[in-house]
């Protein structure tokens, strides 16, 4: 899969989803059951299952974001908008008194668990890393279920002293199909020959 990278210019807005190129990108993927664990005052709240730990926002749930994600069944959502306020390290300052941010890996683990095969995670951040291809879970390096190559990256420039808005679209692969692909990559000709020899003896 080749990553589609698009760069556009737009005026900044404190509500990221209201920036036209961002809004257009989200609308392109927003089909089926989508959730937003950090919804704040999202313009898409009528089209998503929303959560914000701050009860001042009119969302479906007011839970810790990790607990919100944990309540969904495996492979049960078509997509997730993942837009933590500012950086993952600054969230405590923004949500003063509302508890501690969990390690990113704990979010990523839940996100990969609940997204359906071929579903999407649209991430917002300081870089375009998005969802990791693999990470350590319980001390062991494991595949996360997302393709290594990003589906799409949108860079929205705002000019002046404003930082760009970076959006990454990751797609979860169909695990059965991916297992076949991985098997083909891993098995060498020598291993294949040895297996054939064992089966024919």
Residue ranges and their predicted role:
Residues 70-81, 88:
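A short acidic, Gly/Pro-enriched loop at the edge of an enzyme's catalytic core
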Residues 30-69:
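SAM cofactor-binding core of SAM-dependent methyltransferases
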Residues 40, 86-87, 127-130:
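Short "lid" loop at the C-terminus of a central beta-strand within the Rossmann-like core
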Residues 1-46:
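S-adenosyl-L-methionine
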Residues 118-125:
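Conserved beta-strand signature within the Rossmann-like core of class I S-adenosyl-L-methionine
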Residues 127-199:
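Class I S-adenosyl-L-methionine
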Residues 98-117:
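A short glycine-rich, Lys/Arg-flanked "PGG" loop and its adjoining helix->strand segment in the class I
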């Amino acid at each position: 899969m080749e990553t589609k990278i698009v760069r556009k210019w737009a005026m900044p807005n404190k509500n990221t989803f209201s920036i036209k190129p961002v809004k257009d990108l989200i609308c392109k993927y927003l089909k089926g059951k989508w959730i937003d664990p950090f919804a704040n005052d999202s313009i898409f709240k009528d089209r998503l299952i929303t959560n914000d730990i701050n009860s001042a926002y009119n969302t479906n749930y007011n839970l810790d974001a990790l607990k919100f994600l944990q309540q969904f069944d495996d492979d049960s959502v078509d997509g997730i908008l993942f837009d933590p306020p500012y950086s993952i390290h600054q969230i405590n300052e923004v949500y003063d008194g509302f508890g501690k941010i969990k390690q990113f890996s704990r979010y990523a683990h839940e996100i990969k668990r609940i997204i359906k095969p071929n579903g999407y995670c649209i991430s917002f951040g300081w870089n375009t890393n998005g969802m990791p291809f693999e990470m350590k879970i319980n001390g062991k390096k494991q595949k996360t279920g997302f393709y290594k190559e990003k589906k799409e990256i949108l860079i929205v420039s705002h000019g002046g002293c404003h930082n760009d808005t970076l959006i990454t679209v990751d797609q979860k692969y169909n695990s059965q199909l991916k297992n076949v692909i991985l098997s083909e990559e891993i098995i060498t000709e020598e291993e294949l020959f040895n297996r054939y020899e064992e089966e024919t003896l």
